[in-house]
Amino acid sequence: MKALSKLKAEKGIWLVDAPKPVMGHNDLLIKIKKTAICGTDMHIYNWDEWSQKTIPVPMVVGHEYVGEVVDIGQEVRGFKIGDRVSGEGHITCGHCRNCRAGRTHLCRNTSGVGVNREGSFAEYLVIPAFNAFKIPDDISDDLASIFDPFGNAVHTALSFDLVGEDVLITGAGPIGIMAAAVCRHVGARHVVITDVNEYRLELARKMGATRAVNVSKESLKDVMKELGMTEGFDVGLEMSGVPSAFHAMLDTMNHGGKVAMLGIPGGEMAIDWSKVIFKGLVIKGIYGREMFETWYKMASLIQSGLDISPIITHHFKIDDFQQGFDAMGSGQSGKVILSWD
């Protein structure tokens, strides 16, 4: 089968002929229709320090996808051949304390599809049936293929009550932009998103952000004054991993504010903890998606009218994968879809 593999311990990704994955008794065999390129895939493509420590070579990568069930393990119940599915990319152990308590997204033994095991940049993928999510008929393949990052946005945004609240999002990558759309959809008052990438900020405006602020040109505090905000942001969503962005968030949070952190800093990050203490801030770390509450909320948000389609800016056939990675790496894109049909 065709697959995109991290074939060598160097920058790049390669289109190869790979063996079809072998299915176990509790697994589904999925014929991939569309995949999306994630920021994690770009780290692997660029072969950065994290990738060098984490990714076995060679390995098929990728973890954002939609496909069709074409075979079912003999112990599987609840799925049938022809079901259209996406899937949770975090494979959990099922026996640690968090798994047994229903907090599977916090499993300490998590294995990542396309990170620790064969991924979805291939004509076929095998995953445990437990991890598969049936896609409703009224949700397109394009949207289903980005459910993984959309889930990060939903999990982060819905960590705290948003109705009537003022929200600051630092980092206008695709996940931050989708989080802005979620916040507006569920009833936040002002949703302000910051970045220095004007292309991405314009996407955020299209997706409903109240203000998309280029912090290299405009002061966040000036924007707050323009919006009539006198007390600070009630909710902060840190999506960038950039220390200066998080510092700006701490400076502008209201007393009693709540912060959800998804962005991963490149190294240790010092902050002024007195601001956290004296403002009484709550900080919550976010990893992945809640299984499977986030997935049902994703589908329901789209079915209730949330439109995240503007975040998808590029489509390529799999044979043109290099153009897709180039587009994603340029910073002048939203989500990039690769078609396997």
UniProtKB/Swiss-Prot annotation:
Q: In which pathway does it act?
A: Amino-acid degradation; L-threonine degradation via oxydo-reductase pathway; glycine from L-threonine: step 1/2
PANTHER family, A to Z: L-THREONINE 3-DEHYDROGENASE
Family to which this protein belongs: Belongs to the zinc-containing alcohol dehydrogenase family.
Q: Which residues form a coiled coil?
A: none
The entry's active site is: T40 (charge relay system), H43 (charge relay system)
Keyword annotations for this protein, in alphabetical order, are: Cytoplasm, Metal-binding, NAD, Oxidoreductase, Zinc
The EC number(s) given in the record are 1.1.1.103
Q: Which species does this protein come from?
A: Shewanella baltica (strain OS155 / ATCC BAA-1091)
Binding residues annotated for Zn(2+) 1, in chain numbering: C38, H63, E64
- SUPFAM superfamilies documented for this protein: GroES-like, NAD(P)-binding Rossmann-fold domains
What is the protein name given in its UniProt record?
L-threonine 3-dehydrogenase
- Catalytic activity, as annotated: L-threonine + NAD(+) = (2S)-2-amino-3-oxobutanoate + NADH + H(+)
**Root EC class:** oxidoreductase
Binding locations of Zn(2+) 2: C93, C96, C99, C107
Q: Record's GO cellular component, any one?
A: cytoplasm
Cite the SMART domains for this sequence.
PKS_ER
Source species, domain of life: Bacteria
